[in-house]
Design a protein with these regions (language model features):
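Short glycine/serine-rich loop segments
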Residues: 1-27, 207, 217-230, 254-259
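A short helix-breaking turn/cap at a secondary-structure junction
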Residues: 1-101, 279-291
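Short, well-ordered beta-strand elements
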Residues: 12, 246-249, 254-266, 270-278, ...
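Short amphipathic alpha-helical coupling segments at ligand-binding clamshell hinges
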Residues: 19-23, 105, 179, 183, ...
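Short helix-loop capping/hinge segments that flank enzyme active sites or metal/cofactor-binding pockets
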Residues: 52-93, 121, 135-191, 233-258
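Hydrophobic/aromatic ligand-binding patch that stacks against planar heteroaromatic rings
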Residues: 112, 214-217
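Acidic helix-start/capping segments at beta-turn-to-alpha-helix junctions
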Residues: 125-137
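Short, Asp-centered acidic motifs that coordinate Mg2+ and/or phosphate
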Residues: 202-204
Length: 291
């Protein structure tokens, strides 16, 4: 289903980068039904030796995490506001603990790449207000589901919290037009400046989480997310959710991932490098226990 017409993208999900490349080879390119599709080439077999690629890494994503700052109670906080704040703080605490644990896998990936002969080049994401641009996604999503909101059928959705889609769609109607236009102007700068990074390198290695996730959603640069191991027994347990059950995020035995980014329409280079990493690690062959 559509959520954001200028940010939605289709891509294969498969066991390996090679399988993804084979599927993308079959589905890429215009079909005459979508005027936004560019007739870019995808020559998986013609990439050549991946050793000739310049490989960068987002240095800030591999630095030690900063201490977590939780929201403090506001003056005159109501019980409902307190509940929301405590829930938000609990989610942030769980996310921070999981990220701190997972970082060992990211650092090990850099070591593995160096062992493969990769000369890693440190790069930085351009300093732009990516977080302020996320309202573009919400506004487009609200437009895509406007009939649902106006009909009142959005009340049938079970998740009705402040940050759940029904309420985000409702509040999107109050976005000032000036702020929406300014966010689009900032997005144009993001496309230009992130694209400029790929004048320096061909591939960027980064953690799967972090601001790059927001940035590449806005700029449309291709991303390949590959398995990067399984969490050990000491991994933080998933947090509880509203119904008292454990969330399905993280926990011992669950997989971690790593992200590779490339310039626009350089998906074939991306797949070739991801394939090389998987050949050297074998993480794509692991299976988490399902009992």
């Amino acid at each position: 289903m559509a959520l954001s017409w200028t940010m939605d993208k289709l891509g294969p999900i498969a066991r390996s980068a090679e399988d993804c490349a084979l599927v993308l080879q079959a589905i890429h390119g215009p079909d005459g039904k979508d005027a936004s599709v560019v007739p870019a080439t995808f020559d998986w077999a013609g990439v050549g030796d991946w050793h000739s690629l310049r490989i960068g890494y987002l240095k800030s994503e591999f630095n030690p995490l900063q201490p977590l700052k939780l929201d403090e109670p506001a003056a005159g906080e109501t019980p409902e506001k307190k509940k929301d704040r405590e829930k938000r703080n609990a989610e942030q605490t769980a996310s921070h603990a999981r990220r701190a644990y997972d970082q060992r896998y990211d650092l090990a990936a850099l070591d593995k790449l160096r062992a493969m002969g990769v000369q890693l080049i440190p790069v930085q994401l351009p300093k732009l207000p990516y977080g302020a641009m996320t309202n573009l996604l919400t506004a487009e999503g609200a437009a895509a589901f406007d009939d649902l909101t106006l009909s009142g059928r959005d009340k049938l959705l079970t998740a009705q919290g402040p940050e759940d889609w029904p309420n985000l769609f409702r509040t999107a109607r109050f976005y000032p037009a000036v702020e929406y236009i300014q966010a689009n102007r900032a997005r144009t700068l993001a496309v230009q400046q992130v694209s400029a990074l790929f004048n320096e390198v061909d591939i960027i290695v980064t953690a799967t989480t972090g601001m790059q996730l927001v940035a590449t959603n806005l700029t449309g640069h291709p991303a390949l997310i590959v398995p990067n191991g399984l969490r050990g027994a000491a991994a933080p347990s998933p947090p509880k959710i509203d119904d008292g059950e454990n969330d399905d995020i993280g926990g011992p035995g669950t997989p971690v991932s790593l992200t590779f980014l490339a310039g626009h329409y350089q998906d074939a280079q991306l797949a070739a490098f991801g394939h090389a990493y998987q050949q050297a690690t074998g993480f794509h062959k692991l299976h988490p226990k399902l009992d």
